[in-house]
């Protein structure tokens, strides 16, 4: 026992501050991360997040900001509140449409900042702001390239089935996808592990044969922890979660992600 204790203390000394703050560098996960980065086998299915990843949210942010009396500085708080309560809803064994949670979050943020928004007003703001969102400029060309290369493309969103259907019709994205998946059908929001497992089963593939492409660090983290591969699009204001495993592909837009994926065999 004393020898074990002495060895433990000795190892702590060897690790030093670097080992305590960045254990991956000391405990041998470097090779694992290297393997992730050099995996160039083709995923069987590419799953795409929708809002921010494929669709440009500039218009939505302006409308929500207007509802908050021009307080665009509150937009990030509104979105994180919406995400927080989607997690609360799932963790409590409940389900509400993401749009309804977004409207409730809008009311909460407004109330905390002395702004009055009724339930009906909040729902109209969220519903109207999500309609007619355009695709990011590079999205259609990138999707066409991936489809031409034989990839199976599936959208995978926290939004409702009807909501994403209308969004795709408006943005002209419908024909690029083989399938549309919504968490509405499983009743659990991303990034819960069960939700990614459900999507893999739905498409008849193993978790390790899936790749999520998303512009949200929380979504990418959830996918990787669920055993998926992932590509992160670093849209402005978006960051990877530093405590999550390494992400296989990190690029600034979907075209650059596609350029990497077409080299996979």
Task: Locate each region found by the language model.
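N-terminal secretory signal peptides and thylakoid transit peptides that target proteins
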Residues: 1-16
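Active-site neighborhood of HAD-like aspartate-dependent phosphohydrolases
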Residues: 35-83
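Glycine-rich phosphate-binding loop signature in dinucleotide/nucleotide-binding domains
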Residues: 40-41, 149-151, 203-206
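An amphipathic alpha-helix signature
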Residues: 61, 75, 79, 99, ...
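A metal-dependent, Asp-based hydrolase signature
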Residues: 72, 86-124
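Substrate-recognition element of Asp-dependent hydrolases with the DxDx(T/V) motif
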Residues: 121-134, 139-169, 181-183
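Asp-based, Mg2+/Mn2+-dependent phosphohydrolase catalytic module
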Residues: 144, 160-161, 165-265
């Amino acid at each position: 026992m004393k020898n074990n204790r002495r060895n433990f203390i000795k190892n702590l000394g060897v690790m030093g501050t670097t080992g305590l703050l960045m254990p991956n560098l000391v405990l041998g996960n470097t090779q694992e991360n290297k393997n992730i980065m050099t995996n160039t086998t083709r995923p069987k299915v590419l799953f795409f997040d929708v809002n921010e990843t494929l669709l440009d949210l500039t218009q939505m942010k302006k409308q929500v900001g207007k509802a908050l009396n021009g307080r665009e500085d509150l937009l990030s708080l509104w979105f994180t509140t919406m995400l927080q309560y989607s997690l609360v809803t799932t963790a409590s064994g409940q389900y509400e449409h993401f749009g309804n949670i977004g409207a409730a979050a809008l009311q909460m943020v407004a109330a905390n900042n002395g702004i009055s928004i009724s339930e009906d007003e909040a729902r109209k703001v969220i519903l109207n702001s999500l309609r007619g969102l355009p695709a990011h400029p590079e999205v259609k060309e990138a999707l066409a390239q991936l489809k031409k290369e034989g990839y199976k493309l599936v959208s995978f969103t926290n939004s409702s089935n009807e909501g994403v259907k209308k969004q795709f019709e408006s943005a002209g994205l419908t024909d690029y996808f083989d399938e549309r998946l919504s968490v509405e059908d499983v009743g659990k929001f991303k990034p819960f592990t069960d939700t990614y497992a459900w999507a893999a089963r739905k498409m008849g593939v193993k978790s390790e044969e899936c790749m999520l492409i998303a512009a949200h660090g929380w979504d990418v983290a959830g996918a990787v922890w669920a055993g998926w591969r992932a590509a992160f699009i670093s849209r402005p204001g978006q960051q990877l979660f530093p405590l999550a495993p390494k992400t296989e592909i990190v690029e600034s837009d979907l075209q650059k992600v596609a350029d990497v994926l077409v080299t996979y065999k």
